[in-house]
Amino acid sequence: MTNGHLHPLTQFLRVSLQYFTERGFEIAEGPEIKTEWYNFDALNTPADHPSRDVQDTFWTKGGKVLRTHTTGTDIRVIKENKLTPPLKLIIPGRCFRNEATDSTHEHTFYQIDGIAIDKDLNMGHLIGILDGYMKELFGKDLETRVRPHLYPFVE
């Protein structure tokens, strides 16, 4: 008889969350149905931004949305818990986009969002955390590089 095993996504999340918690991040979670304020306004997404359109976002009859990302959870957790720096949060979760599905797009996907606020943190810290994370996932011999780029579709 063959023993069962964990789903690949569960395995990925366990490795990911362990990596970040070992580095002082706390895991935060939030609802999959959000207010427009937490999903867009709190993140300074303009009212006329294409991501707010019905062809990109699932809207409920009550004016709420299925979250399009986990980033708005950062704001909610910090606000509701009156958190102050220093803080490190990691937010995993399922996200939804009202898109046509193809080989590179799905209406549902998982995202891991992180935020770290402290004195003297800089891009070197971010790059170090992400480099270590990629090595945790793909092996210590992985070579990474940072390639700054402008993505106007997310501006």
Residue ranges and their predicted role:
Residues M1-E155:
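TRNA-recognition modules of translation machinery and tRNA-sensing kinases, especially anticodon-binding
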